[in-house]
Amino acid sequence: MRAVLSLGSNLGNSAEILSSASEALNEVSEVIALSSFYQTRPIGGPPQPDFLNAVVIIETNLEPEELLLVAQAIESAHGRERNDSTVKWGPRFLDIDLIKCDEMLINSPELTIPHPRAHERGFVLQPWIEIDPTATLPGFGPISDLLESGPLTE
């Protein structure tokens, strides 16, 4: 399965954290491409530092639900805490979102594929089109069209 994941960090050494997360993904899957890092303003939440974002494309034998668990384990290994006191859209050492898994459509309590807000997030679409200019998002069409139609959240 080919999967697209977005990576984000705004605490600690974000560039090092994103590189480390990509390396960790490569240990369980094959990283096909990693975008440049993009500095973006946070969306909502409390006042916080800008994010560093990237997109990675992997080839994996994992099922989407297994890949989600791997992504969450990588987040935890980099200091991410998930609990009731976690601030939605708050600062974090690492955030990994599954954006696309082949052309699958998944809507379960644990996982929604494609990511339900990917089509409106410039910080996902811009790095993604850099490494896959012909990319499409199931249900939304070509990434290039989404970027042209704007306005997008940084």
Locate each region found by the language model:
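A general structural signal for well-ordered alpha-helical packing
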Residues: 18, 22, 31, 53, ...
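Flexible, gly/pro- and Lys/Arg-enriched active-site loops
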Residues: 35, 43-50, 65-68, 72-154
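Short beta-strand-to-loop capping motifs
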Residues: 9, 56-62, 100-103
